[in-house]
From Swiss-Prot:
Region (Alpha N-terminal domain (alpha-NTD)) residue spans: 1-234
Function statement: DNA-dependent RNA polymerase catalyzes the transcription of DNA into RNA using the four ribonucleoside triphosphates as substrates.
Region feature (Alpha C-terminal domain (alpha-CTD)): 250-338
Catalytic activity: RNA(n) + a ribonucleoside 5'-triphosphate = RNA(n+1) + diphosphate
Gene: rpoA
Swiss-Prot/TrEMBL GO biological process terms: DNA-templated transcription
InterPro entries (UniProt xref): DNA-dir_RNA_pol_insert (IPR011262), DNA-dir_RNA_pol_RpoA/D/Rpb3 (IPR011263), DNA-dir_RpoA (IPR011773), RBP11-like (IPR036603), RNAP_asu_C (IPR011260), RNApol_insert_sf (IPR036643)
The protein's assembly and partners: Homodimer. The RNAP catalytic core consists of 2 alpha, 1 beta, 1 beta' and 1 omega subunit. When a sigma factor is associated with the core the holoenzyme is formed, which can initiate transcription.
Stated name of the protein: DNA-directed RNA polymerase subunit alpha
Amino acid sequence: MIERNWNELIRPEKPQIETGADATRKARIVAEPLERGFGVTLGNALRRVLLSSLQGAAVTAIQIDGVVHEFSSLEGVREDVVDIVLNIKQLAVRMHAEGPKRMTLRATGPGPVTAGQIETPADIEILNPDHVLCTLDDGASVRMEFTVNNGKGYVPADRNRPEDAPIGLIAVDALYSPVKRVAYRVEPTRQGQSLDYDKLILEVETNGAVTPVDAVAYAARILQDQLQIFITFEEPKAKSADESKPELPFNPALLKKVDELELSVRSANCLKNDNIVYIGDLIQKTEAEMLRTPNFGRKSLNEIKEVLAGMGLHLGMDVPNWPPENIEDLAKKFEDQI
């Protein structure tokens, strides 16, 4: 059965999400348990896709009144144009439409000029409005125009310069990815009595254009889409729930272990010492047999009778074909009914 290649691998539970004060920018995502080696496999693949392949928006070109090239300086502006361009590269932008789009900045000194002073169209958001672009002296003023586009990955300035670029247009390196940092580590984790499994811990930081949780989801979807072409066979038809579960000649609740019942420590220890593991073992005992169990008294008997009554069961029941040979496998198959 080819499906055993993937069906018999352990699958992680729903990821645990840990966020700090700003859940829109930083999060730790934990997935466990994973088969040995899958922590590095998945962590490395997700990290590479997160940093390289998510769509975002960035400034691709600027024009500053009175500036012909990026090695100029502006009277009354403390930073030179090279520093201003570096500051502009750190703008965090979210676009709700296809680009390119234009933004404008007009400012008068004295004081710092921040990203929040940029005039944007309705479909553009500035996500770090307190970010300082430059500082003006008293009486100085500045006017800039920005071209914003959407894309993925890193695009160098020379590819952002149009062939018919006007004099004074400064092309900017564009880093479109909304993901600023990704780190992962793999730790051993327990599954049952075994420590031979992986726990993947992803730490993701974004610029706020997308949440870390959504960024990981998009990266996983990209990987899913790219890997799909390698699946060259038809999936075996999944069995329905009724087909996959055998008929039981007894109540599935009998497959529940007695240590899962809310019993006192004394009662639980008595059952354990008498090798009573499943409820199916317990209900076949009579009251007299239970009272002959060492340290088992009338109080424990009444406690167990009350718990069984709540399940529609009682002591002294006859259960044909108990215990079944594959009792542990049956308990897993019917755990949703136990």
